[in-house]
Amino acid sequence: MTPFGARLRELRAARGMTLSALAARLAVSPAYLSALEHGKRGTPSRGLVHQVCEAFDLIWDDAEALARLARLSRPRPRLDTAGLSPEQTALANRFADTLPHLPPATVAAIETLIATAHPARPRRRRG
């Protein structure tokens, strides 16, 4: 499951909305929405994320958080190590091999380390 899919499911459950009802409201098939929730589809489009935000009447901060989760929800992320050091390339490969076997506490610790070492920059608003 992707971060976006997990949050989408939480939002839907909190409002007592069925998968079919939300799919109809978003004008997508229930199969597509289920695949999105389970991480079997790619990153949702900005338009779909916007529709979800409207369907759940999310406030600005929650809508931004959902959009951020969508950007972090590529089910098959790729990392091009061309131009990186041998150490960085080795780390990327080792991480790819190890990640599926890491316990949740270790994943959380790595996420904290990355967030501390490279804080996310706020997105600039267009328009």
State each model region's role.
Residues 1-14, 109:
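A short, Lys/Arg-rich alpha-helix, primarily the initiator
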Residues 8, 22-23, 33-36:
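Conserved hydrophobic/aromatic packing and binding residues within compact polymer-binding modules
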Residues 13, 24, 54:
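Alpha-helical residues within the helix-turn-helix
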Residues 27-43, 51:
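Recognition helix of helix-turn-helix/homeodomain-like DNA-binding domains
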Residues 47-65, 71-72:
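DNA major-groove recognition helix of helix-turn-helix/homeodomain DNA-binding modules
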Residues 71-127:
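Interfacial/linker helices and their anchor residues that mediate assembly or domain coupling
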